[in-house]
From Swiss-Prot:
Record has Transmembrane as a keyword: no
Organism (species): Brassica rapa subsp. pekinensis
Lipid-acceptor residues (N-myristoyl glycine): G2
Gene Ontology BP terms: protein transport; vesicle-mediated transport
InterPro entries from the UniProt entry: P-loop_NTPase (IPR027417), Small_GTP-bd (IPR005225), Small_GTPase_ARF (IPR024156), Small_GTPase_ARF/SAR (IPR006689)
First and last residue of the signal peptide: none
Superkingdom of this protein's organism: Eukaryota
Location(s), subcellular: Golgi apparatus
Protein name: ADP-ribosylation factor 1
Annotated catalysed reactions: GTP + H2O = GDP + phosphate + H(+)
Length: 182
């Protein structure tokens, strides 16, 4: 009964819950982004072995955010977390031009997953503060985002340690999910 009341209350007052996966190669800044969004500050992080999960309340949406480790050995396990996902935040280290091709391959593999067909995609072109970082247009080209025709997506330049661009991306994501597109 309590769950039914909670769902009715949420639907009347516009609250929504969404399951979000934060994916990307190792050292892209996924965990820094998660805790910047949740706590509003930068926390010291170590490479994620497995996952971190936190709730982020934003713009009348309760995001259940799953930050999955990005090491090569962990990536095959990402698919275990795909069911019931409304959105993917794909984080790219814009300064790691040596691995942008690998980031593209992993990204397009994710897009092909049947269990993520209905998920909207938010790309964070992270680490914009570092020398040689690709801007959002260059990351768009490198990831071949123009090939995405069957789902809504957006890309935002971000700097997780400074908090730049993150909430603009979350605004887009929450508005997209509220409009029922996600």
């Amino acid at each position: 009964m309590g769950i039914l009341f909670t769902r009715m209350f949420s639907s009347v007052f516009g609250n929504k819950e969404a399951r979000i996966l934060v994916l990307g190669l190792d050292n892209a800044g996924k965990t820094t982004i998660l805790y910047r969004l949740q706590m509003g500050e930068v926390v010291s992080t170590i490479p994620t072995i497995g996952f971190n999960v936190e709730t982020v309340q934003y713009n009348n949406i309760k995001f259940q955010v799953w930050d999955l480790g990005g090491q090569t050995s962990i990536r095959p396990y990402w698919r275990c977390y795909f069911p019931n996902t409304q959105a993917v935040i794909y984080v790219v280290d814009s300064s790691d031009t040596d691995r942008i091709g690998v980031a593209k391959e992993e990204f397009h593999a994710i897009l092909e997953e049947e269990e993520l067909k209905g998920a909207v995609v938010l790309i964070f072109a992270n680490k914009q503060d570092l020398p040689g970082a690709l801007d959002d247009a260059a990351v768009t080209e490198a990831l071949e985002l123009h090939k995405i025709k069957s789902r809504q997506w957006a890309i935002f330049k971000t700097c997780a340690v400074k908090g730049e661009g993150l909430f603009e991306g979350l605004d887009w994501l929450s508005n997209t999910l509220k409009s029922g597109s996600g």
